[in-house]
Amino acid sequence: MERDSNTAKSEIFYSNPAIWRHLKDGKGEGMSKSEKRNKHGCRNFTYSIWNCIRPGGWSTWSKWSKCREGIRKRRRTCNNPLPIGTTCSGQKVEKQSCAISSNVPEYLFGSWTSWNPWSRCDCDRSLRIRTRHCKGNSCEGCDKDYEDCRPDECPISKKWSEWTDWVNYGIEQVRFSAWCSSSNVANTEVGIRKETQDSMKHANWSEWHMHPGVAYRYRLLHNSSISIEHHLLSRFTSSCLPLHFAIPIFCFCILTGFLLQNIIYCVVNRFKRRFIRLNYSYDSNPRDYPSHLIRSPGSPKDESFW
C-alpha cells in the first residue's frame, strides 16, 4: 500500500535486495521503502512505518529588546527544520546586561524621591510620619514610614469613661467608671473607680428559721443614724408561730386532749366500780343493799358491773 507523497518532506529509506539506502527526494515522510526482485527479475516494492528521528535547527536570533532594569533580551525558535523525535539543544532566550541611556525619559521607570522630614507627633495615636513620592510609572516599596513619639513629646492626659447604671447590692447601690492615663502608647495606665450609695428600699423578709424554743426571721433595713456607715443587720423575732406551723400543732393538741380525756374517763370509772364493790358486802337482809344492786329472781345474770 503506497502513501501519498505530496505531504511528505522527510527522508525515506530505499533498499535494493536486502540493502537500505537513503533517498532525499522528499517523499514518504516517516516511511521506509524496500525493493526486491524475484527469480524472474520482477520488481516488488513494500512499505512499512519507520521511526525516523531528525534533529531540529534554530532560527536566527531576534533583535535585542529595549534595556529595562539593566537587562535586555533576544529570542530564537527551534523550527529550522522542525525536529522529529527530539528537540533543539541550546538556549531559547539570551540575556545581556545593559545601561540605560541618559536620554530615556525618567517617567518610564519609576524611582523614589528622598524622604520628607518627620511630621509632628500625633498624640492621639502616639505616632509621627514621614512620606516620599514615586517619580515615574511604578515604584517598589512604601510611600509612608512611621515611628513612635518620644515620651516627652505629649503631655500626660487622663480620660474617664461614662458611669455605668446603678446596680443593687443588698442595702446599697454600686456603679463603676474606667479611666485611662497615658502620654504615649508605651506608657499607659488603666484603672476603675467605684461609687456607692444607700438603697432606699428595705430588703424582703427572709424565710422563717426554727431553733429550739424559738422561730425567727430577719431582713436588711435601710441604714439609720446608727448604721449609716456600718450597714448593721437588724433581726425581728415574732412571738407568734407562722400559720403553717400553728395549724399542725393545734390539731395535734386537740387529738392528744381527746385521747387523754377518754383514757382518764375509763380509768376513773374502773376505780369507781371497784371501790363500790369493796365497800358493800352481801348479808341476809336485802334492804341493806342499794336497790340497783338487788337482782330479782329469774333475772338474767349480768356480771358486767362486777
Curated annotation (Swiss-Prot):
Cysteines engaged in disulfide bonds, as pairs: 121-149, 123-154, 134-139
Post-translational modification: Glycosylated via C-mannosylation by dpy-19 at Trp-58 and Trp-61.
Cited SUPFAM superfamilies: TSP-1 type 1 repeat
Matches recorded under InterPro entries: Compl_asym_regulator, TSP1_rpt, TSP1_rpt_sf
Pfam families on file: TSP_1
Domain of life: Eukaryota
Membrane topology, from the record: Single-pass membrane protein
A single BP term in Gene Ontology: regulation of canonical Wnt signaling pathway
Role description: Required for determination of left/right asymmetry in nervous system. Acts together with unc-40 to control an initial left-right asymmetric polarization of the Q neuroblasts. Mig-21 and unc-40 may control the asymmetry in Wnt signaling response by restricting posterior polarization to one of the 2 Q neuroblasts. Involved in left-side QL posterior migration. In right-side QR, unc-40 and mig-21 pathways mutually inhibit each other in posterior migration, allowing anterior QR migration.
Protein name: Abnormal cell migration protein 21
Originating organism: Caenorhabditis elegans
Lineage of source species: Eukaryota, Metazoa, Ecdysozoa, Nematoda, Chromadorea
